[in-house]
From Swiss-Prot:
Pathway: Lipid metabolism; phospholipid metabolism. It is found in: Cell membrane. It catalyses: an acyl phosphate + sn-glycerol 3-phosphate = a 1-acyl-sn-glycero-3-phosphate + phosphate. GO terms for molecular function: acyl-phosphate glycerol-3-phosphate acyltransferase activity. Probably interacts with PlsX. It is a multi-pass membrane protein. This is Glycerol-3-phosphate acyltransferase.
């Protein structure tokens, strides 16, 4: 019963859409109706600028960290793993916003930073290298999320499966980006969208 409460609580924490709130407060827009239509940091960056994107990334990361930490601290390891998955599901498919959310990268990073700081930093570092080299945020994110389960494997099979679920969700949410990467139509970082 307690694990179910943890899952539900984490899911609704995930529903707290930083990009939606930032869009409303700074420009009175629904970020999902601008740019790529995604409720995430990259779309906020292209639509509203660096400061708004930084706030979005920070907020989405913190909710991932908070969900995993609280479940781990007050319930246990297994509950924390479930909370980590639930908060990302809540971010990606928020019932409070008609199931139209983000892609879960910042929230997954937040979860991973508490679950395994070393695995998180290693994955982020690889993502940053890819971003610097190719200038595609999507490719950077996909690469970091693909490698994350393997960095988590040293903590045991349970952590590997946990990482694999997070990875699959992230890649699934990037399926349109993957199509554009293949056709050469994906936007590189720095290209701004007008509101």
């Amino acid at each position: 019963m307690i694990n179910l409460l943890v899952i539900i609580s984490a899911y609704f924490i995930g529903n707290f859409s930083t990009s939606f709130i930032v869009g409303k407060l700074t420009s009175n827009i629904d970020i999902r109706q601008h740019g790529s239509g995604n409720a995430g940091s990259t779309n906020v960056l292209r639509t509203l600028g660096v400061k708004a994107a930084a706030l979005t990334f920070l907020g989405d990361t913190l909710k991932g960290m908070l969900s995993f930490y609280l479940a781990q601290r007050f319930v246990g390891e297994q509950a924390a793993l479930m909370a980590g998955i639930a908060v990302v599901i809540g971010h990606n498919w928020p019932v409070l916003l008609g199931f139209k959310g983000g892609k879960g990268i910042a929230t997954t990073i937040g979860v991973a930073l508490i679950a395994s700081p070393l695995a998180a930093i290693a994955s982020i570092s690889l993502g940053v290298v890819i971003l610097y080299r190719y200038k595609y945020v999507s490719l950077s994110s996909i690469t970091a999320m693909t490698i994350l389960p393997f960095f988590l494997f040293s903590y045991g099979l349970e952590y590997f499966i946990f990482g694999l679920v997070l990875s699959v969700m992230a890649i699934y949410r990037h399926r349109e980006n993957i199509k554009r990467l293949r056709t050469g139509t994906e936007k590189k970082i720095g290209r701004k969208t007008s509101v």
